[in-house]
Amino acid sequence: MKMGFLFLFCYLLAFLGYSPVDAAVKKYQFDVQVKNISRICNAKPIVTVNGMFPGPTVYAREGDRVIINVTNHVQYNMSIHWHGLKQYRNGWADGPAYITQCPIQTGQSYLYDFNVTGQRGTLWWHAHILWLRATVYGAIVILPAPGKPYPFPQPYQESNIILGEWWNKDVETAVNQANQLGAPPPMSDAHTINGKPGPLFPCSEKHTFVIEAEAGKTYLLRIINAALNDELFFGIAGHNMTVVEIDAVYTKPFTTKAILLGPGQTTNVLVKTDRSPNRYFMAASPFMDAPVSVDNKTVTAILQYKGVPNTVLPILPKLPLPNDTSFALDYNGKLKSLNTPNFPALVPLKVDRRLFYTIGLGINACPTCVNGTNLAASINNITFIMPKTALLKAHYSNISGVFRTDFPDRPPKAFNYTGVPLTANLGTSTGTRLSRVKFNTTIELVLQDTNLLTVESHPFHLHGYNFFVVGTGVGNFDPKKDPAKFNLVDPPERNTVGVPTGGWAAIRFRADNPGVWFMHCHLEVHTMWGLKMAFVVENGETPELSVLPPPKDYPSC
């Protein structure tokens, strides 16, 4: 589908009432409803927002108040997470089911009411219950406040590029069947760009996303990895990309032929249409440098110069190989914060509390499973059990018996985390255990991958905060040597960090946002297996530094 993106973008801004003097409240209605969709020769009903796949883009400006009424018309419980929005003191609007809210039940509505404070750039929203985010997701575009230009050349046009996955089967049915077996769910059947798999898949010529471009212009692409289980390379045939933002934080610009995004991450790039007029494939394919199966198929969209006929065959880009670890490490090493007077990198230099979390897979007994066991995942050997009452409500109202606050700062036993694969004694502890944090504590957290069953990369997302990725490495983290190599000047600031396969990532943040904040692997299969936990950040000393009261329409469990 071809679109005049500049016209559409300007139309949306006008429709939403943007102007330099009048940009305060943006209101949206999200109707969660079923719609029949056909992809790669298969038709099925899917859960959507407003009948759109992907769902509608939320546009706002830095400083706006956003009010989104979500009405659930489907058989499943629903909740929506606004991925990357900090929700200061307002976890009630964060969205993860049974963490900050009870889900929205069939026939009910919930008003997500939040402020966009101190943030601008590309984020996204998605369902945060079951595997419904397979089809329930969309972009969030936060424009700079009036009078604050981009810290890079003004683009001629902007376009959203949302990378996703498609299953021919009903996803929830497939997941339930896998859980009964105690096995992983099936891989997706295709990747998508803006819901379309592109012409390399059968029955997909008309399901191809197209950008019609003018020669000699600069385009801003807002790229989002909304896939459930795949890290993805992205590139454009014949064109370089200049990275200018990650996870809605400006970066020092650098040019590359391909980018890498883990699930949950966003990247903004500038693309100059300075090649000979032609049709060029934009493509995405998986990165996997561990012995784990992935949907190793390439999704394509088209960058088409104006005046070039549709009969011209597009040119394919040369993306990195699926196991190109060196590219991944080199690419991530180039990501750095701007750290300018207007956009400082406020890295905590003094650390109040150091945490060391091991990430691993396991096998637990499962009497109801066909094989008698099921796969599990854990942090510090604890597999998280979802509560039946929202954790934030239990914390706010002092409801006992819902969770414990004794999540350990370190694993129960030290071992050679990334040595030979460990395949015995793989049982994990289970529980709803949280880590209690005093307000304004500065935290350094090292996330260490382990070779329990297998090593694997893990995109970890922290709700309620951005953090600085001060260091990464391959192998076991060395607390005596590795901190000396930390970047404390201009490290990348993110909300989702990729922990390297068989390696570690160190992050720092200041716990100045009171509430209950979820942290989990953004590979949906690992989250389902329990690779998650939460922080309970205590209130500050004044009401202005404390959790706001819950809204009147707060859902009940």
Swiss-Prot record:
A molecular function (GO) held by this record is: hydroquinone:oxygen oxidoreductase activity
Organism of derivation: Arabidopsis thaliana
Plastocyanin-like domain residues are 31-147, 158-308, 406-541
Question: A Pfam family for this UniProt protein?
Answer: Cu-oxidase
- Which family does the record claim for this protein? Belongs to the multicopper oxidase family.
| Signal peptide interval | 1-23
Q: What is this protein called?
A: Laccase-11
Q: Provide the residues annotated with a glycan attachment (glycosylation).
A: N36, N69, N77, N115, N240, N296, N323, N371, N381, N398, N416, N440
Q: How is the cofactor bound?
A: Binds 4 Cu cations per monomer.
Per the UniProt entry, what are the Gene Ontology biological process annotations, in alphabetical order? lignin biosynthetic process; lignin catabolic process
Q: Which PANTHER family match?
A: LACCASE-11, MULTI-COPPER OXIDASE
Expression across tissues is: Ubiquitous and constitutive.
Where Cu cation 4 is bound, by residue?
Answer: H458, C521, H526
**UniProt function note:** Lignin degradation and detoxification of lignin-derived products.
Gene that this sequence comes from: LAC11
Keyword Repeat carried by entry: yes
Give UniProt keywords alphabetically: Apoplast, Copper, Glycoprotein, Lignin degradation, Metal-binding, Oxidoreductase, Repeat, Secreted, Signal
